[in-house]
């Protein structure tokens, strides 16, 4: 069995959202905010010969933080793909932002740690 290596970087952001399709009076329909964490995992079976690693963790951190900063202190609903800003759609949004530059991307996790909620997208 071939070993598989996975590396993960995490970023944080704060953002507001609301769920417009919720019934009138629902707390989820009202504008509210959360602190979020997002983690991106890249997988490889073979390490880079020149460096002995799966990928450059610094570059992964840069790209993940750049994506998170796009959302930071903003309204999630304003971003294409996040009109219904569930954790699931946030996972898809981050995957779509990173997938082109990170072919080994295998997992995105978005969490709201203060309320103990998270979603994992396995690619």
Q: What residue spans do the PLM features occupy?
A:
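Charge-rich, low-complexity N-terminal segments
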Residues: 1-123
């Amino acid at each position: 069995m071939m070993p598989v290596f996975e590396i993960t970087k995490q970023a944080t952001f704060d953002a507001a959202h609301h769920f417009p399709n919720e019934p009138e009076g629902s707390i989820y329909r009202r504008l509210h905010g959360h602190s979020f964490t997002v983690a991106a995992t890249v997988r490889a079976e073979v390490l880079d010969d020149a460096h002995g690693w799966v990928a450059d963790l610094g570059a992964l951190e840069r790209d993940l933080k750049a994506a998170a900063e796009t959302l930071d202190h903003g309204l999630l609903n304003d971003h294409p793909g996040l009109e219904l800003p569930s954790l699931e759609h946030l996972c898809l949004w981050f995957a779509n932002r990173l997938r082109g530059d990170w072919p080994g991307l295998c997992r995105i996790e978005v969490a709201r740690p203060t309320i103990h909620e998270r979603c994992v997208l396995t690619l």
